[in-house]
Regions:
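P-loop/Walker A NTP-binding region and its immediately flanking N-terminal helices
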Residues: 2-181, 191, 199
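Extended, largely alpha-helical regulatory/partner-binding modules appended to the mid-to-C-terminal parts
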Residues: 70, 76-85, 112-115, 128, ...
Length: 275
């Protein structure tokens, strides 16, 4: 089995080198913002975080709340990198070893939190801070929350905790009171459509602005969903993204159907209207 897998990987690698093929990367990952100024639709939060860093006024426990796909984890990762970059002169250092991510949906027990607390005691070897990003924090058990309280209230000076959740109401009040809370908003249709236009231009795709607007509306404020829909429609329509292609792919009634229906009503053409 190992030999078969090794051979398959070798063949794929050789094909990529020979024919210039590259694995497809979804737009949500390919265009994930690397800097605060690249984050879409959360200017108030990104400006607040940048000012907090520059004025050395950053809380050690932050809670990022909001719907899915609006930039909570992205902002957490940017923040984690930026706070260690301050005053550091090595351009090639990414401080990856200073950032720990925990998915509370699958690591929600007391033992998981105690293991995290044991790590927190160890200071970073490079950079100023160790950053602990706990995603879906509302999934922690009651006992896990209680075990986490003391560390969250009095963290070591080298530790920053960033908690992210889509369901703030499920987090116990004692945790909320220990965190600086940032409420992420849904991305507006205009902001999402504008960002999709930039991506379309980057990929040399001729995109109808109405089509991009339809995708943004369908995403319902989630930029990640908008990018996922964009990838799907591009796979369907190729390098030309039209209103008709988006309507067909997303099972949306095209605006022409509405106009035609209104015309038939005004003309009192009941048979054609029923058809």
């Amino acid at each position: 089995m190992f030999i078969f897998v090794y051979c398959a990987i070798s063949i794929m690698t050789r094909a990529i080198q020979t024919f210039g093929m590259a694995p497809f990367i979804v737009s949500a990952r390919k265009y994930r913002p690397q800097h605060f100024e690249d984050v879409v639709g959360q200017q108030v939060i990104t400006r607040t975080l940048e000012n907090a860093i520059s004025h050395n006024h950053l809380a050690q426990a932050l809670l990022f709340c909001g719907p899915r796909g609006v930039g909570k984890t992205t902002c957490a990762r940017i923040l984690a990198k930026k706070i260690n970059e301050e005053g550091h002169h090595s351009a090639d250092e990414d401080f990856a070893f200073n950032v720990f991510e925990l998915d509370a949906a699958s690591n929600n027990s007391v033992d998981d939190i105690r293991s995290l607390i044991d790590q927190v005691r160890i200071p970073p070897q490079v950079g100023r801070y160790k950053v602990y990003i706990i995603d879906e924090v509302h999934m922690l058990s009651q006992a896990a929350f209680n075990a986490f309280l003391k560390t969250l209230e009095e963290p070591p000076k080298h530790a920053i905790f960033i908690l992210a959740t889509t369901e703030k109401h499920k987090i116990i009040p004692t945790i909320l009171s220990r965190c600086q809370i940032f409420d992420f908003k849904r991305i507006t249709v205009a902001d999402a459509a504008s960002y999709l236009k930039v991506i379309a231009e980057n990929q040399s795709i001729e995109a109808d602005e109405v089509a991009l607007h339809m995708i943004a509306q369908k995403a319902d404020g989630a930029m990640r969903d908008a990018l996922s829909i964009f990838d799907r429609v591009v796979s369907f329509s190729g390098k030309s993204l039209t209103r008709q292609a988006v309507a067909e792919n997303l099972n949306i009634l095209d605006v022409d159907v509405y106009f035609k229906t209104v015309q038939l009503i005004l003309a009192a053409d009941i048979p054609s209207l029923l058809i």
